[in-house]
Amino acid sequence: MTLLAFALDALAIAGQTLTGRSLGAGDVVGTRALTRRMMAWGAGFGGAAGLLLLASAPFVARLFTTDPAVLDAAVPAIVAIAVIQPLSGVVFVLDGVLIGAGDGAYLAWAGLLTLAVYAPLAVGVGWAGGGLTWLWVAYGGFILARLLTLVVRERDGRWAVTGA
């Protein structure tokens, strides 16, 4: 799963660089168009990664263990991870875009809001004894909360400031 995060983080780095360059050149309209294109690439790459992970879920866990109890827990968790990937692709891109735009203050506040959503979900999993798959489902709630806060910011356009 860390390997997927590294691949998605590469999209964030590209988003930072391209956004900084485009806004630095004073091209707000081009930056917005570039952002939409990168969001599509993020969703597409995340979707492809999710499908690959989904197709390989029964085999991936076997690379690490033969213990039947671990395999029984791992495969549904890997499926949950796979479902999250398309959302994660867009989240990573928008993180990069907003970092490249110098919108760190918004990202900090959005992070607190996301934590306010995720913490009860994660604690609830532990309290209810939900197990590994439900912990990944809770993490999906974290990703969804991040996606919503980032898309709201992308749509309002206040991040696209030249000369910042």
Question: Could you say what each language-model-derived stretch is?
Answer:
Residues 14, 58-67, 97, 101-104, ...:
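Transmembrane helix-loop junctions in multipass membrane proteins, especially transporters and channels
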Residues 48-75:
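Short membrane-interface helical motifs at transmembrane helix boundaries
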Residues 49, 88-91, 145-149:
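Membrane-embedded alpha-helical transmembrane segments of multi-pass integral membrane proteins
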Residues 72, 115-148, 152, 156-163:
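Membrane-interface helix-loop junctions in multi-pass transport and translocation proteins
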